[in-house]
């Protein structure tokens, strides 16, 4: 399988001069380089970047690895849609957020997760989840929705059928892209998981035990993760 690391966001909460995917771990290793090398064991790896942050990634990756998706601010779903349109893959694809530290356990989960005509989402049960996923609804806490005390949180990685994702992304854009911007009930971006809320795409939840979630939003969260690994 090929992998796409999504690293084209605005990172408004990270507060750093460099993209958060390029943050350095305590051991001096660059996060995106580590994740690239890990995912490379499963197949070719590509990284989405924006017009603004491409120059930072070129210090570590060649142009063939980078997929420029334009200006930031259109959301993770838009970046996935544009990357698939450029790559035109004919097999299942791993989509991975750039703000996660990938471990051997993550690779094991990706290798063993089912592949369907839709989205397979490895999840784990969490107390007070930041994002809460069910097969038919995704709650986004960052947009102020009331969240359950316990729920299933994604592991920042997904296995997708590129044909289904492209088809339902087009359906989403037809309905929610107006005047040069996305517009949904929770914001003005196309979140990748909006496909669950707003299209009839098939979803398989793979509940995973014994795995640490090394994802982050802020610099402090990254610093804490870097000390743990």
Q: What do these predicted ranges mean?
A:
Residues 9, 99, 125, 218:
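Active-site glycine-centered loops adjacent to acidic/histidine catalytic or metal-binding residues
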Residues 2-5, 13, 29-97, 102-107:
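Conserved N-terminal catalytic core of the sugar/cofactor nucleotidyltransferase
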Residues 4-8, 24:
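A conserved hydrophobic helix/loop-capping motif in glycosyltransferases and polysaccharide synthases
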Residues 10-16, 56-57, 167-169:
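Short acidic/His/Gly/Ser-rich catalytic and metal-binding motifs that mark active-site loops
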Residues 18-24:
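Short glycine-enriched, charge-decorated loop/helix-capping segments at active-site entrances
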């Amino acid at each position: 399988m090929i992998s796409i690391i999504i690293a084209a966001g605005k990172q408004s909460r990270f507060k750093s001069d460099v993209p958060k995917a390029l943050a350095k771990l305590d051991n001096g290793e660059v996060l995106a380089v580590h994740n690239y090398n890990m995912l490379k064991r499963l197949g070719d790896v590509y990284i989405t970047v924006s017009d603004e942050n491409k120059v930072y990634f070129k210090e570590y990756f060649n142009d063939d690895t980078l997929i420029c998706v334009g200006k930031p601010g259109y959301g993770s779903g838009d970046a996935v849609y544009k990357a698939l349109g450029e790559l035109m893959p004919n097999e299942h694809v791993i989509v991975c957020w750039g703000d996660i530290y990938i471990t051997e356990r993550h690779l094991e989960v990706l290798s063993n997760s089912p592949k369907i005509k839709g989205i397979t989402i490895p999840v784990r049960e969490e107390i007070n989840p930041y994002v809460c996923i069910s097969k038919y609804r995704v709650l986004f806490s960052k947009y102020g929705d009331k969240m359950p005390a316990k729920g299933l949180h994604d592991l920042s990685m997904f296995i997708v059928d590129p044909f289904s994702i492209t088809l339902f992304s087009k359906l989403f854009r037809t309905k929610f892209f107006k005047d040069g911007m996305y517009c949904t009930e929770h914001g003005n971006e196309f979140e990748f998981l909006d496909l669950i809320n707003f299209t009839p795409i098939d979803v398989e939840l793979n509940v995973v035990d014994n795995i640490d979630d090394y994802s982050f939003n802020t610099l402090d969260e990254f610093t804490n993760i870097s000390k743990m690994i």
